[in-house]
A protein has these predicted regions:
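Conserved active-site and cofactor/substrate-binding residues in soluble primary-metabolism enzymes
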Residues: 4-7, 37, 48, 52, ...
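Anion-binding alpha/beta catalytic cores of soluble intermediary-metabolism enzymes, centered on
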Residues: 26, 89-90, 96-169
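Active-site cofactor/substrate anionic-group-binding motifs, chiefly glycine-
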Residues: 41-95
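Short, surface-exposed connector motifs at secondary-structure boundaries
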Residues: 38-41, 91-97, 149, 174-177
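Glycine-rich phosphate/diphosphate-binding loop of Rossmann-like nucleotide-binding domains
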Residues: 47-60, 142-186
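Short, acidic/turn-prone active-site loops that include or flank metal/cofactor-
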Residues: 74-76, 124-128, 182-185
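Hydrophobic beta-strand scaffold residues
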Residues: 68-70, 99, 120, 177
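Positively charged, low-complexity intrinsically disordered leader regions
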Residues: 1-55
Length: 186
């Protein structure tokens, strides 16, 4: 979230609301009018298991007219004495228009960000889970029927990657956030 302006984050939420409204009469696999991602490929790499993230990204890209290529790190030479992240990032940049990484390594996320020449989306890392928080903001605004900036949000639970992203989002979206974390879960 730190790399995207508050204005652009708000545009993402507004666009998602508009697209959801326009999709009410479309089936799950029908493509949005205008196919904004026609001819575009999102490469997804999962180092951690995923159900919702994988399916959500696949369907979102499909509904926008694009395609996905899903990889597991164990299917690549990456980290197995073969290619470096630098080389892998260069290769992936030639085949895709965007890259989504779900990883258990913050360093790997930063290295891919450094060496890719295409946009990267953090699908989950040890320190952040921005896509989860954006979908949470979308849902809260949809249910409460007002911008999150007009709400007080409370987090009770362990201190984790979702909380880190929620803290960042509270600054970007200007909402009040109260946090309660048990001592053994700091």
């Amino acid at each position: 979230l730190k790399d995207i302006s508050s204005k652009d984050l708000r545009k993402i939420i507004v666009d998602a609301k508009n697209r959801k409204r326009l999709r009410t009469k479309l089936s799950t696999l029908e493509v949005d009018k205008g196919s904004p991602l026609k001819g575009k490929i999102l490469i997804q790499m999962f180092e951690k298991p995923s159900s919702r993230t994988r399916i959500s990204f696949y369907l979102a890209i499909k509904q926008l007219g694009g395609g996905t290529l899903t990889l597991r790190s164990n299917e690549l030479h990456l980290g197995q004495g073969g290619e470096s992240i630098t080389d892998t990032a260069k290769v992936l940049s030639t085949y895709g228009d965007g890259f989504m990484l779900r990883t258990d390594s913050e360093k790997k996320m930063e290295d891919f960000k450094k060496y890719l020449s295409i946009p990267i989306i953090n699908g989950l890392s040890p320190l952040s889970h921005p896509t989860q928080v954006l979908s949470d903001i979308f849902t809260v605004e949809e249910i409460k029927k007002k911008p999150i900036s007009k709400l007080n949000i409370c987090w009770i639970g362990d201190s984790n990657n979702v909380l880190n992203s929620l803290i960042a989002a509270s600054v970007k979206f200007s909402f009040k956030l109260r946090i309660g974390c048990p001592k053994k879960f700091e």
